[in-house]
Regions:
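Short alpha-helices
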Residues: 1-53
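Hydrophobic helix-and-loop "lid/oligomerization" segment in the mid-to-C-terminal part
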Residues: 38-166, 171-206
């Protein structure tokens, strides 16, 4: 399975015989896309060919450690305070389903001076809780009248199917996204419905 669009781009370039034309800057972009789409290579990344591709990108002179720092370790104070608020006030764990939910309203985002990208990775946070294997993040969009939905899972749980069935979306097995047009209360209720529907799969060991 292809880990990301960036990996697909790399494969296409190579298929066309243009690997030698990849610049360091282009290699950095491809690596960054692969890294972010796999959560720092923590999901959708068990195919050994991914690491061969990384070795080829390294041969172009990229500094993967610096890329990681620039993406994940350059947060604003507001983002960290928002993260603390989310974990303490806006996260609900459903141990009976091995699942968790995070949600944010527009008013809450304004309170912390939200900037685009400030919530990047928030959906992954509940997955660090023991036995939680499915996490959903609902965020009222600050530009459109809709709710952005991010879904993450571990193991074989198909969050892409949940995204397609409930949130007009799709994606990878363990990383998907979608949209919801309605109120936050309605979106939360829909999430709870999908827990019931997928209970058996959520409680599987793999």
């Amino acid at each position: 399975e292809i880990s990301s669009t960036s990996e697909l781009v790399f494969r296409l370039i190579c298929r066309l015989g243009n690997f030698d034309d990849i610049s360091r800057e282009a290699a950095e972009c491809i690596y960054t896309g692969m890294m972010t789409d796999t959560g720092g290579f923590t999901y959708n990344s068990n195919n050994r060919e991914i690491y061969y591709i990384i070795s080829q990108l390294l041969s172009k002179g990229i500094d993967k450690d610096e890329i990681y720092r620039n993406v994940f370790n350059t947060y604003s104070e507001g983002r960290l305070r928002l993260m603390g608020f989310v974990l303490y006030e806006k996260m609900q764990v459903f141990p009976e389903f091995n699942a968790a939910l995070i949600w944010l309203t527009r008013a809450e985002q304004r309170r912390f001076r939200f900037s685009k990208g400030d919530t990047e990775g928030f959906v992954n946070l509940p997955l660090s809780i023991k036995k939680v294997r499915f996490s959903v993040f609902l965020r009222e969009d600050t530009e459109k009248d809709m709710i952005k939905v991010s879904l993450r899972s571990t193991g074989t749980f198909p969050c892409n199917k949940v995204a397609a069935d409930f949130f007009n979306g799709g994606g990878h097995l363990n990383a998907s996204g979608g949209e919801f047009y309605g109120t936050m209360e309605e979106a939360i209720n829909l999430f709870k419905q999908d827990l019931v529907r997928y209970e058996d799969q959520l409680l599987m060991k793999k």
